Amino acid sequence: MSKKLIRFDWAIKRLLRNKANFVVLEGFLSELLYDNIRIKKILESESNQETDDDKFNRVDILTENSKNELIIIEIQNTYEIDYFHRMTYGVSKSISENLSIGQAYENVKKVISVNIVYFDLGQGKDYIYQGKTEFKGLHEKDILELSHRQKAKFLKENVSDIFPEYYLLKVNNFTGNAKDTLDEWIYFLKNSEVQQGSKAKGLKEAEQVLDIMQLEKDDQYSYNRHLDNLSLKASEMISLQEEAEFRVKVNRDIENAVNGINEGFDNLTISKITKLSIEQIEKLRTDLEK
């Protein structure tokens, strides 16, 4: 049976920032991007330091891929209804913070935003989504391409290679066992354990680096606090969802009661249909007569 490991969202802000442990992050990013990714350094950017929430949920990583291109990888993990807006904000800050005053715009680095979410974000059945920027003609329906001169100067093939790229991992949508090496990583992100027989890059090292029993006493305390906070947030989300569902039901019952009043039904009949009390229905009648 696989052993439980430290959650990735906590480890990435603590253990995996250590250069000796870069191999774990490199493995994850290499499997996700289907490329050979090497981490150059963890960026101590302004956006990593402004608030406790930013510091806890986000890390910017300067990496190098197989084409010797420098890429900023942004990994976020948080519980927010406006998470899509947060993604946009994070990418914008990464771009602006890594272009010095007076530098030409051609020095803007490619940003890949990797977002790991453990809650229901948007509507979709898949568990891995990719987003990129393309310009499509309104009349000709063609895709705008780089000119030959631009390709030679910027060493890019497509316009989308310049603009930010997004990966959204909805790990709770993943069910069953892993079918490929990327799935093996998703399985780990969801279950905090490595599936037996996994061959994905970085997972073997993750089993060693993220062993809970290897944590120092202070780190164990911090990690347990993190787990408690996650449980509290999950309970808050369930409570908010239940409250919202209750409000929807009450509003539906009131709407049905009003329709019943307009149709001439008596209070007892309306009460049986809607489960509202006679007093509530009488108040509705009074309000409608005003």
Where are these regions (language model features)?
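Generic recognition of short, well-ordered alpha-helical interface segments
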Residues: R7, V23-V24, D82, N177-D180, ...
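Short, charged alpha-helical interaction segments and adjacent helix-coil junctions
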Residues: S66, I71-Q76, D180-K290
